[in-house]
Amino acid sequence: MSRFARLLLIVALFFTGAWAKTVKETLRITWKEGAPNGQARELIYTNGQFPSPTLVWDEDDDIEITVYNEMAKNVTVHWHGLDQKDTPWSDGTPGLSQRPIQPGNKFVYKFKASPPGNHWYHSHEKMSLVDGLYGAIHIRPKGDRTGLWSQISQDKDDIKAMENAAHDPEYLVVSDWSQYTSEEYWKISTDSGLLVFCLDSILVNGKGEVYCPGQKFLQAELAPGLVEDAFPPGTEVSDKGCFPADLDQVQGGPWNITKRPDLIPPRVQEGCVASRHENATIVVDPSRNNGWVSMHIVAAATIAQITFSVDSHEFWLYEIDGNYVNPRKFVSAVMSAGETFSVMIKLDQKPGRYTMRIPNSGASQVLGGFAEMVYKGCESEEKTGKAYLSYGGNPTSPDVEKNSFFPWQLDTDHMSPWPPNKPRPGNADEEHLLVLGRVGAPYNYTMNTKYLYPVDFQNDDPLLFYPNATRDTENDGLVLRTKNGSWVDLILQVSTLPGDTSSFEHFMHKHGSKTWRIGFGAGVWNYTSVEEAIKERPKDFNLETPGLRDTWITAFSIGGEAYWSVFRYFVDNPGPWLFHCHIELHLMGGMGIAILDGVDAWPEHIPEEYQLC
């Protein structure tokens, strides 16, 4: 090698190292009493705080995180939205990539900080997300985003200001909260024979209150037409805003089990007890970044479907699930459990205190959530501004409804990737039909007609190390296998199983890769291929500008009409990846499936430190 060539190599290595640095983090997981909404219960703390610390890295950093389990129960940590390319052993999913971290033990996760954007991390052991292990992740990008910001403003100062604002955003981790731990909550359902999904609070950055505005107020806050379309005449919510637990429209069936609503403890469904505590306050400075502020929002909810709005402030939605999208302006946006949004807000209003309204917008419960956005220097305690949402999440005017983001409406959920990124047209190489719904009990959920994914499935023999462990067994119905380099279509059908024709929506999350939603329609999927469906229903498909995400809603009709969705992805990341509903009750009830992507190129050289003993 010549002296000049060696010099070039040294320079190249220098700049490569300048981009990629090693970042080491330590997370200590503990269990103790706390009262984030003013009412005490035991919960998970991470490094002594709740929610877990926000982690900020640069794209392509080498990340090394040591997790110490100082609880008396198992834990794992999943890095939601990170692709884990070439590091499937660090995905944090028990039974697929690792064994659970047992009490007193530790586990070291190593991976690249990729892709850039807004992500989050959370526990993935049983229903323990309910107990509070979740935090935001922000991976700052290397690339130029001028083309993204120029869709919002052509002003050069604005473009630079938005880039700076996005580099240093505000973080909102939004979660739902119950007075019961995850184990207690699940036991209520199995003891009573009823699916219970009534909550106490919506928290923002671990802060909130318990509101008891009265039953009549809550009844008036029901979404227009909800009772008429979905429930028997005269159905009323409780003083917590919850529908009666034993309604057939809620529980489905009939199931061959005994329903015991009398075994639901007091204050679960009704018997609201208010508590004054504190709501999160986000202080914003209109003198910085030309008056622009970016907010990264994590829907760390376990049941609720939340709606985000800030009084008197429009926002530009520019990122979903860590993927940049062509920005669109809204006044409110519905987020499903597991999703992440990034929004850009212009601070162009009178300095003051503006309420951030973040209610549950799903059909499960009328429940309000709040925080405050306060202009820096504002000394008044009085709130100001025009509300876009009511307590229960209803638009306050027809104009608000027209300018809101609804994931179940394709005209508003047309958020195409920036820069353009579309899937292969025509047929995929593989197609898999998954029929979702309930089987046997109100709390049992399946993704393939009948099989329930156990929460401890393959915990002792993770599929990364034993990919053929389920072959020739009934458990192989819980596993899909794909080939490396193939295009795959996942066809999801909802509301067709016996006893589950009025199924609630599901929030479907795939580990290891994002998917394009290329098709979506009402009815029963009875086509021999996606290609046939495209020919017969071309208006229900979009292969030119489909959205690209890792979490999608399966739309539903409250009246019971069936729906299907088609998700396409390219297999280039061999490993065992969980595909599941991000509603914790549904996953606990069995709504998951293991996808072994690239079985013909399975990881052979697993680092020694990750090898099983």
Curated annotation (Swiss-Prot):
Glycosylation is annotated at: N74, N256, N279, N444, N468, N484, N526
Pfam families hit by this protein: Cu-oxidase (PF00394), Cu-oxidase_2 (PF07731), Cu-oxidase_3 (PF07732)
What keywords are annotated for this sequence in UniProt? Answer: Copper, Glycoprotein, Metal-binding, Oxidoreductase, Repeat, Signal
Known role: Laccase; part of the Pks1 gene cluster that mediates the biosynthesis of an anthraquinone derivative pigment that contributes to conidial pigmentation that provides protection from UV radiation, heat and cold stress. The polyketide synthase Pks1 produces 1-acetyl-2,4,6,8-tetrahydroxy-9,10-anthraquinone though condensation of acetyl-CoA with malonyl-CoA. The dehydratase EthD and the laccase Mlac1 further convert the anthraquinone derivative into the final conidial pigment.
Protein family = Belongs to the multicopper oxidase family.
Asked if the keyword Glycoprotein belongs to this entry, the reply reads yes
Any idea what this protein is called?
A: Laccase 1
Q: Which InterPro entries match?
A: Cu-oxidase-like_N (IPR011707), Cu-oxidase_2nd (IPR001117), Cu-oxidase_C (IPR011706), Cu-oxidase_fam (IPR045087), Cu_oxidase_CS (IPR033138), Cu_oxidase_Cu_BS (IPR002355), Cupredoxin (IPR008972)
Q: Which residues bind Cu cation 2?
A: H80, H122, H582
KW Signal (keyword) present = yes
Annotated EC: 1.10.3.-
Chain residues that bind Cu cation 3: H124, H511, H580
Named in its record, the pathway it takes part in is: Pigment biosynthesis
* Species of provenance: Metarhizium guizhouense (strain ARSEF 977)
> What are the residue boundaries of the Plastocyanin-like domain, all occurrences included?
29-142, 171-359, 468-598
Q: Which residues form the signal peptide?
A: 1-20
Cofactor names: Cu cation
Enzyme class, UniProt record, top EC level: oxidoreductase
The UniProt gene name for this protein comes to: Mlac1
> Where in or outside the cell is it found?
Cell surface
Q: What is its main location?
A: other
